[in-house]
Structure formats: structure tokens, C-alpha cells
């Protein structure tokens, strides 16, 4: 079929060459910013749509239930030992609070994936900011745990208990304040937007309608990469290499070796859950900066990868309680007593469900001095 080379609308006739020139003018204009990703929004295809509409509600609901119950149990058990808990357990208490914040935003993520964002700008800003606060606080708390273990084991720093607890509480307060400050760009610039194609659902996104907002978005992205992930992971890696090296030399202190294992495992789980998301987000940042060859196909693949990797990262909020349950002897003992007191389960049924509980608890719980002891 041969298409006409002109468009006749009443008394106005547009030549196709003139139309192309007008489009080129508007695409180069600074008054009407256009993003290439708007023209690639349909590349995702039905796979991502099905994932958001079918798999995401089921999976996120499961994560919500497990994360809610698990982290509340962690908080209850740690709160019962408030006056005797160690510095690591204090950091883990705040980590559980941060994970609960992440759990609370999961229903909003499910709703947005199914029907779009229909809850207004205020909740849009709040949910995106809570997501960022959770991540920053989690990574900074894990870095503090690594530094605390490094100072206690490698340099044998043992401060006076009251002064030490005060410094830990001040550190945790500073971490929450830092998480809030790092999330300020989201609080200021997040808004509900309608994608270019009218068939798409409204989304809660970081607004990039002008140059100032775009610069704020890139600043937030690089702060997320460097301050929220890269630097804390470097600190954790440096500290735990030193800790492991010292523990290998002190083979006569098996209890100390067991006590630090939970911190390394928690950090490893955090890295495994969030590193794929950060790698994909970093590639997306490079693609938006035109540092790599951009195409609709690449944008589509990155969009799918971001959604899948974000799901893995969000699943992290329900994994820490499981880790404490299956690895911490004292934690298992306290959990067993709590569930028995609540009438949820008795010691016999728990031992049948987890055969290794009774054996490990009898042999090691008497020597356990910390909830995070293995």
C-alpha cells in the first residue's frame, strides 16, 4: 500500500518533510523535554505485564506475611532482652524495624502493578521515601555491625558498658537521620505521572520534567549506588576480612568464632539480594546518561530486569528472621519459649518439626551468651 506524502486537514496541507522538521525542532527544544524511554514503553511485552498482574500479588503477599510475622517476632524477642542484649543485637533490632518499613510498602507495590498508582501524591512520596530509608538504614546498620565486630575482635576494644550502649544508640539515631536525609530527593520530587502511551497505568515516579529535577534524579541515583551500596559493602568486606583473619589465628576461642558468624551471614544475604538490583540500576543509569548505546530493546530488557531484581531485593526483608531461627541457638530457644507461652506450639512439636533444634540447644545453649550465638 502506498501512503500519501501529504496530510490534508481542511485548508491546511502539511508536507511530510515539513512535518519531520517540526518534530525535529520540538525534540531538540529545551522547553519540551522528551525522553527516549517514552517511545520504548511497549517493548516490555506481555511477560512483564503478566508478572505484575499475576505473580507479583501472590509472591509479595507471601513476603508480606513472612516478613511481618518474622520481624515482629525478632523485635519481641530482642525487646525482652533489652537490658542484656549486645551491641550487635541492638543493631539487629533496628535492622528489623527497617525491614518492617519495607514490609509495609509491599501492598502499595502490588496495587501499583495491578491498577496503577491511584493513592495520590502524598502517599507516593511517602512510599518511595520509605523504600529508600529502608535500604540506606539496612546497609549502614550492617556496616556498623561489621565495624563493631572488627573493633571488638581485631583491636579488642571493650568500652564501659553504659558508655558503649549510649554510643550505639547515638549511632543508630544518626543512621535513621542519615536515611531520612538521603531520601529527601524522593520526598521533594516524587509524583504521580502518566506515561506517554495513554494505555499505560499511572505510576509513582521521580519527576524529571525539567533540568533541575533531572539533576536531582541523577544525584539521587549516584548517592544510592555509592553511599547506599558500594561504600558500605567495602567497609563490610574490609572489616570481615580482618575479623576472619584474626579468628583463624585464635582457634582456642570457638565461641567467639560462632558469635561473629551470624553477622557475616546477614551481610552475605543482604549482598546476594541487593547486588543484582544495583547492577541493573547502574546499567540503567548509564543508559540514561547515554554512556552506553541506547535502544528500545535495551530499555525493555532493563525494565524487565529491574522489576525482577527489585523483587529479589524486597524478598530480603523476610530472610533475616529465618536466618536467626535456623542459625542462632539462643534465638531458637527464646523463640521456642515465646511460641509455647503464646500457645502456638510446644517444645515437642517444634523438635519434631526441626529435628536439629533439641540436639543443638542442649549442647550449646548453656554456653550461649548472645541471641545471635550459633
From Swiss-Prot:
InterPro entries, alphabetized: CCR1-9-like (IPR050119), Chemokine_CXCR5 (IPR001053), GPCR_Rhodpsn (IPR000276), GPCR_Rhodpsn_7TM (IPR017452)
Cell location: Cell membrane
Record topology, Cytoplasmic segments: 79-90, 148-169, 243-261, 328-374
Tissue specificity field: Mainly in spleen, in resting B-cells.
A Pfam short name: 7tm_1
Gene Ontology, cellular component aspect: external side of plasma membrane
Transmembrane listed as a keyword: yes
Keyword Transmembrane: yes
Extracellular topological segments: 1-57, 112-126, 191-221, 283-306
Protein keywords: B-cell activation, Cell membrane, Disulfide bond, G-protein coupled receptor, Glycoprotein, Membrane, Receptor, Transducer, Transmembrane, Transmembrane helix
GO biological process, one term: leukocyte chemotaxis
Protein topology in the membrane: Multi-pass membrane protein
Disulfide bridge map: 124-204
Positions of glycan attachment: 28, 198
Gene Ontology MF terms in the entry: C-X-C chemokine receptor activity
Membrane-traversing stretches: 58-78, 91-111, 127-147, 170-190, 222-242, 262-282, 307-327
Similarity comment text for this entry: Belongs to the G-protein coupled receptor 1 family.
Function statement: Cytokine receptor that binds to B-lymphocyte chemoattractant (BLC). Involved in B-cell migration into B-cell follicles of spleen and Peyer patches but not into those of mesenteric or peripheral lymph nodes.
This protein's name: C-X-C chemokine receptor type 5
Organism of origin: Mus musculus
Lineage: Eukaryota, Metazoa, Chordata, Craniata, Vertebrata
Gene it is expressed from: Cxcr5
